[in-house]
Amino acid sequence: MNFNLIDINHWSRKPYFEHYLNNVKCTYSMTANIEITDLLYEIKLKNIKFYPTLIYMIATVVNNHKEFRICFDHKGSLGYWDSMNPSYTIFHKENETFSSIWTEYNKSFLRFYSDYLDDIKNYGNIMKFTPKSNEPDNTFSVSSIPWVSFTGFNLNVYNEGTYLIPIFTAGKYFKQENKIFIPISIQVHHAICDGYHASRFINEMQELAFSFQEWLENK
């Protein structure tokens, strides 16, 4: 997958990037509830699992916007991937650990869903941190905490402050006033994403949840 270098000196975001990367190293998270009432009803009728559906939605928004695909490569050069693949957690009740498995993103939901099922079949019961080898560099993290409907979530990433890729976490969905919601948290680096960009992610997730008929059976 192609990694496109960013010319920082001619980048409109340069002063913001340098400020939040070097002067005030800053990451932040935003949590919001996404209504999934009709979506959940529809996928249950079709016997479709919810978790890969949610992962697909997140990956679709990520791949629709360059700011969610910006990072440093292994040489330390800044750039962005043409596309990114989700790496998601699978819980093992037997020993209370989890695995991180990646599936290649596909714009077709049905193809992505099929690939997800194959990966779960092949690797889901292997109790290793990363049971599927050869994870590409162009992945982003998705995790699920389906035991609690949290109202806020924050990860403390201890490094040099150079991890720029967003991290996504979903909680337990819940019912409120005859509607069903799920809390979604996005954690981003302020050098790359402002409140506008994080808000756009939340809003587009909601749009996908409402417009599921346009993509749920997309081949």
Swiss-Prot record:
It is an enzyme of class 2 (transferase). It catalyses: chloramphenicol + acetyl-CoA = chloramphenicol 3-acetate + CoA. InterPro entries: CAT-like_dom_sf, Chloramphenicol_AcTrfase_AS, Cmp_AcTrfase. GO terms for biological process: response to antibiotic. The active site is at residue 190. SMART domains: CAT. Its EC number is 2.3.1.28. Keywords: Acyltransferase, Antibiotic resistance, Transferase. GO terms for molecular function: chloramphenicol O-acetyltransferase activity. The keyword Transferase applies. It holds the Pfam family CAT. Homotrimer. This enzyme is an effector of chloramphenicol resistance in bacteria. PANTHER family: CHLORAMPHENICOL ACETYLTRANSFERASE, SLR0299 PROTEIN. Belongs to the chloramphenicol acetyltransferase family. This is Chloramphenicol acetyltransferase. It comes from Clostridium butyricum. The gene is catB.
